[in-house]
């Protein structure tokens, strides 16, 4: 059996679920092996627990409670924080962008795991990209919460009815997991804090979900998806199906009704608009630009991989998670971009990498779903768990228990649990936190132009 004689370097690109799970599995095998060096490169020095992002946006969970420093959860892996400029699979080099404070560097690897995830897809609509809010990063959640509070503050004292309506209309684009859970949390927040704004009535608050398909939560059990739709409507959320966004200028979103039968020309009667200052875009994802401009063979921007999760023509290079294209042999469609699949691929990629180093047999990746879970509002959820379809309070309780158990550290488990308990007994905070750096020179200049008035 061939053994490693020289020190080999395994480099993992990314710091999301797939990257961290892969690193932990490799640490358990090679953590004390002086012949193997583990390296991780990520833009953020933390793992973000994305399933709870909507609860951060609604103010239920504190921001820092869903982030986990890489250096504390992958202690035997050397970490580089930086943006990846280029991956050269022929020279086996990963190059990082330089900054104003540090130079660009290149890192050599012997084995590579690409787990760079994805970014929001705006489908080429520059105005939407410029003006919409997203739900992908921790910053997105904080900015959205601030925006919601700001809109309530503006509407409270606004006398122009049209402008006031635009403040209180909140449009969520996308009826998948992210969109539906965001809409539910958003409505919960609005209803909870409305009492602090006397002039705003319940009927003034509008949360609208726009979905291009004919159903929400595609891929979920149809009966459960229908249950979710009805519950959301009972909460006052307007769900509009077969609606595609064509533009958003920051004041008005233009939408097109999608017909069953394609037409050569667009009937103007199918075009309408909604006045809103806040559009939340959760309608799709796309691989990061590093993948798109790489030398790897891609399809729809994703890296093509084989049954062992390896990149063809590049032995020892694996791709997992949202950036990899792996087709479900049953449906003949790519697997959805979920954390559950990313973690399953990460475990298999680590196992096959270990087999490759030890010159043993690799295994094909076969995915077995553990179920699906979604929260659709206060104390209500839907779940397919252990082959059983569940809805209502029990599904909500299962969601909380399952995701609480998946939080990597005990201290953060405790903090999130306490956040949930506090939310049961106390009101949500309506403070709007502004993190923009103070512009000192501009402020002093403006001050000099006026007399001191006290």
What does each model-found stretch correspond to?
Residues 2-86, 170, 177-220, 454:
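Beta1-alpha1 glycine-rich phosphate/pyrophosphate-binding loop at the start
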Residues 37, 79-94, 187-307, 313:
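A Rossmann-like FAD-binding core segment of flavoenzymes
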Residues 18, 117-120, 183, 285-287:
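Short glycine-rich anion-binding loops that position phosphate/pyrophosphate groups of nucleotides
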């Amino acid at each position: 059996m061939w053994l490693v004689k020289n020190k080999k370097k395994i480099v993992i690109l990314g710091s999301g679920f797939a990257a961290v799970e892969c690193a932990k599995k490799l640490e358990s095998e090679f953590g004390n092996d002086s012949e193997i060096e583990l390296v991780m490169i990520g833009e953020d020095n933390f793992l973000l627990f994305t399933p709870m992002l909507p609860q951060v946006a609604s103010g239920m969970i504190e921001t820092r409670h869903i982030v986990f420093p890489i250096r504390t959860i992958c202690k035997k892996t050397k970490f580089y924080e930086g943006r990846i400029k280029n991956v050269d699979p022929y020279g086996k080099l990963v190059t990082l962008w330089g900054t104003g404070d540090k130079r660009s560097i290149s890192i050599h690897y012997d084995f590579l795991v690409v787990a760079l995830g994805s970014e929001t897809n705006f489908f080429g609509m520059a105005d939407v990209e410029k003006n919409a809010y997203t739900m992908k990063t921790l910053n997105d959640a904080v900015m959205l919460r601030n925006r919601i509070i700001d809109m309530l503050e503006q509407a409270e004292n606004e006398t122009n009815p049209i402008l006031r309506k635009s403040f209180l209309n909140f449009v969520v684009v996308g009826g998948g997991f992210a969109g539906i859970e965001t809409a539910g949390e958003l409505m919960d927040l609005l209803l909870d804090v409305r009492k602090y704004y006397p002039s705003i009535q319940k009927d003034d608050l509008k949360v609208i979900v726009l979905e291009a398909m004919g159903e929400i939560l595609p891929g979920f059990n149809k009966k459960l998806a229908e249950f979710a739709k009805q519950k959301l409507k009972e909460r006052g959320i307007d769900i509009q199906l077969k609606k595609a966004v064509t533009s958003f200028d920051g004041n008005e979103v233009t939408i097109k009704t999608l017909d069953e039968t394609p037409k050569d020309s667009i009937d103007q009667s199918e075009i309408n608009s909604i006045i809103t200052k806040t559009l939340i875009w959760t309608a799709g994802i796309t691989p990061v630009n590093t993948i798109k401009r790489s030398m790897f063979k891609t399809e729809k921007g994703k890296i093509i991989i084989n049954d062992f999760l390896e990149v063809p023509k590049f032995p020892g290079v694996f791709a997992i998670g949202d950036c990899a294209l792996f087709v479900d042999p049953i449906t003949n469609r790519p697997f959805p971009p979920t954390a559950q699949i990313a973690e399953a691929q990460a475990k298999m990629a680590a196992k096959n990498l270990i087999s490759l180093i030890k010159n043993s047999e690799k295994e094909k990746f076969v995915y077995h779903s553990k179920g699906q879970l979604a929260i659709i509002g206060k104390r209500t959820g839907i779940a397919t768990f252990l082959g059983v379809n569940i809805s209502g309070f029990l599904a909500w309780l299962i969601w909380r228990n399952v995701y609480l158990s998946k939080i990597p550290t005990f201290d953060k488990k405790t903090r999130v649990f306490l956040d949930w308990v506090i939310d049961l007994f106390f009101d949500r905070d309506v403070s709007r936190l502004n993190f923009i750096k103070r512009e000192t020179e501009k402020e002093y200049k403006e001050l000099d132009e006026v007399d001191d008035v006290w």
